Amino acid sequence: MCHTSCSPACQPTCCIHSPCQASCYVPVSCQSSVCMPVSCTRIVCVAPSCQPSVCVPVSCRPIIYVTPSCQSSGCCQPPCTTALCRPISCSTPSCC
């Protein structure tokens, strides 16, 4: 169930605790079954060249992406150019 602090647009089945705060989650446009936080951050979709059905939240701190074939030090900001991306932390973003 949604917390009282959730926005009116909250979908009750998608309301969970986010890393930042308890917040509403709503289905994102590129994959209706996936819910992402809407209170502490913006919603973005991974570029279609990366994977159109994958959506990721822009966290309270920057998120960058690395391809599975890259080492943890090889980072790149979206849009990614490969089929799969996953969020990681890294100090100096540089494309793989």
UniProtKB/Swiss-Prot annotation:
Q: For this protein, what is any one GO molecular function term?
A: identical protein binding
Q: Does the keyword Ribosomal protein apply?
A: no
Any keyword ATP-binding? no
Question: In what tissue types does this protein appear?
Answer: Restricted to a narrow region of the hair fiber cuticle, lying approximately 20 cell layers above the apex of the dermal papilla of the hair root; not detected in any other tissues.
Spans through the membrane: none
Q: Which domain of life is it from?
A: Eukaryota
Where does the record place the region 14 X 5 AA approximate repeats?
Answer: 10-94
GO cellular component labels? cytosol; keratin filament
Keywords, A to Z, come to: Keratin, Repeat
Q: Which sections of the protein are sequence repeats?
A: 10-14, 15-19, 24-28, 30-34, 35-39, 45-49, 50-54, 55-59, 60-64, 70-74, 75-79, 80-84, 85-89, 90-94
Query: How is this protein organized at the quaternary level?
Result: Interacts with hair keratins.
Q: Which family does it belong to?
A: Belongs to the KRTAP type 12 family.
Q: What does this protein do?
A: In the hair cortex, hair keratin intermediate filaments are embedded in an interfilamentous matrix, consisting of hair keratin-associated proteins (KRTAP), which are essential for the formation of a rigid and resistant hair shaft through their extensive disulfide bond cross-linking with abundant cysteine residues of hair keratins. The matrix proteins include the high-sulfur and high-glycine-tyrosine keratins.
Q: By what name is this protein known? A: Keratin-associated protein 12-3
- Underlying gene: KRTAP12-3
